[in-house]
Amino acid sequence: MLHQLTLAEIARALADKQFSAEELTRTLLGRIRQLDPQLNSFISITDDLAIAQAKAADERRANGENGALLGAPIAHKDLFCTQGVRTSCGSKMLDNFVSPYDATVVEKLTAAGAVTLGKLNMDEFAMGSSNQSSHYGAVKNPWSLDRVPGGSSGGSAAAVAARLLPAATGTDTGGSIRQPAALTNLTGIKPTYGRVSRWGMIAYASSLDQGGPLARTAEDCALMLGVMAGFDPKDSTSVEQPVDDYLAALQKPLSGLRIGLPREYFGAGLDSRIADAVLAVVEELKTLGATVKDISLPNMQHAIPAYYVIAPAEASSNLSRFDGVRYGYRCDAPQNLEDLYKRSRAEGFGSEVKNRIMVGTYALSAGYYDAYYLQAQKIRRLIKNDFVSAFAEVDVILGPTTPNPAWKIGEKNDDPVSQYLEDIYTITANLAGLPGLSMPAGFVDGLPVGVQLLAPYFQEGRLLNVAHQYQQVSDWHTRTPAGF
C-alpha cells in the first residue's frame, strides 16, 4: 500500500520506477479527502498545485534527476508562507491571507522536488499544546479520536500518524514538534536555533521559534532536515554553519556514547508508566554500547514560569502588526482608526492569543519589566549554563518527552496551567536554543509515548544517529493507529 511507505522507501521506489510521483500524489490526495474529515488535520488541500508539482517531478526524473525528495509528498504547517496559497496561522485574523511569496523552508523543499499536498492545522499563531485553539476547530489524535494530538503542530502530527502523508513540516517554540510527535508515535526534531531559516515563517516568539520535520523515522527526518537546514541571508537569526551529512550520521555505532539522565526529569508529575518506558529505552541503548550517567539540571524547575513571560512578551510585539490595516481581518464599518485597531484585533484573535498578548504586554510594561521580563531572561541564562555543564560530561541527555500521554479534548480547558505543564520537559531546549528530538518509545493504555533526546548545539546528526540506531532494534515506530 503506497500510503504505508516512508519517505526513504518512496525515494527508492520512485528511483526504481515502481510508480510515478503523480500516481502517488493522486493516491494520497484521495486518502486525505476520504479520511481527514475524521481528523481535521488539514486547513487547505492543494490538489491542483500538488498534481502540477508531481508531474514536474516525474519530468525531472525522466531527465536524469534522482534527488531523495524528488516527487515526495509532504504538507506544511499553516504558518509557513506559501506563494498563492492561503497561510492562515490557524487564525480568523489571517483567514483570507494569501502569501505573495514562499518561506525559505518551502522554497528549499519545493526546489528539491517535494510535492505540497496542503497546509496543516495548528494552534492559533502556534500558541497551544493541544491544537484546540485553532480557528478551524480541534485536530483529533488518530490513536484515539476523542484525544488531542498535541500542539501546536497537531495537524502535522495527526496527518503523518494517520498515514495521510509520509512527512510534514512543523515548528517548535516550546515543544511544538516534539510533544505532538510523542503523542502520535512519530519522530520529530527541533533543530538548533538558527539552523533552519525562519524567513517566511510567521513568528510567535522570535528568539524561540525553530522549524523542523515530523516523520515516522529518524531516517526520514534526516532526509527532510538535510534540505531544510542551512544559512539564509534573509533571516537575521540564521547561523552560518555547514550542514552535516545527516544520512551518513545515522550509521555511526553507539559504542562509547555517554547518555545523561537528569534526575529532575523523573520526579513528581511524571506518569510512572512513561518513566518505565523511558528506562526500557535506556536499557536497549546500553546493549548498543552506550553508557549512562545521572546528571542534574537544577534550574529546570523555573523553565515554565520563565517561558510564559518571555514567549508572550515576544508575541505581544510580533502580533502588533496585525491591526486590520494592510492585510488580515478588518472589522466592519470602523468609526475611526482606534476603533479599527481595537475591533479588528478583538474580533480577529482567539481567546488564547489575546490572553498571551495581555500577559506579554504586562510583562514588558513600565514598572514590571525588571520584575518579570529581566528576571525571566536571567533564568534563561542559568538554564543554558546548566546544559553547558551537563554536556561537559555527557554526549546526549535523555528523558521523557511529555509527563503524560494524550489527554481528552476539552479535558484541560478550565485549567490552562495543567496544559502548560505538559511542556515541562521540552521548553528548556528552546530557552537554551539546543537541538531536541522525540522518538516513539512505547504505549500506555494504547496511547503513544515518546523519549526525548537533547544534544549540544548543531549536533542534530548525533540525535538522529541515536534515534535511528534505536529504531533498528525496536518496532514502536512501525505501529499504525487502527482505522488508518
Swiss-Prot record:
UniProt cross-references to SUPFAM superfamilies, sorted A to Z: Amidase signature (AS) enzymes (SSF75304)
Catalytic activity: L-glutamyl-tRNA(Gln) + L-glutamine + ATP + H2O = L-glutaminyl-tRNA(Gln) + L-glutamate + ADP + phosphate + H(+)
Pfam families membership: Amidase
Domain of life of the native organism: Bacteria
A GO cellular component entry from the record: glutamyl-tRNA(Gln) amidotransferase complex
UniProt keyword annotations, A-Z: ATP-binding, Ligase, Nucleotide-binding, Protein biosynthesis
Top enzyme category: ligase
Enzyme Commission no: 6.3.5.7
InterPro entries hit by this protein: Amidase (IPR000120), Amidase_CS (IPR020556), Amidase_dom (IPR023631), AS_sf (IPR036928), GatA (IPR004412)
A GO molecular-function descriptor: ATP binding
GO BP terms, alphabetized: translation
Record: active site: K77, S152, S176
Family membership: Belongs to the amidase family. GatA subfamily.
Complexes and interactors: Heterotrimer of A, B and C subunits.
NCBIfam families per UniProt: gatA
Function: Allows the formation of correctly charged Gln-tRNA(Gln) through the transamidation of misacylated Glu-tRNA(Gln) in organisms which lack glutaminyl-tRNA synthetase. The reaction takes place in the presence of glutamine and ATP through an activated gamma-phospho-Glu-tRNA(Gln).
Matches recorded under HAMAP family: GatA
Name the record gives this protein: Glutamyl-tRNA(Gln) amidotransferase subunit A
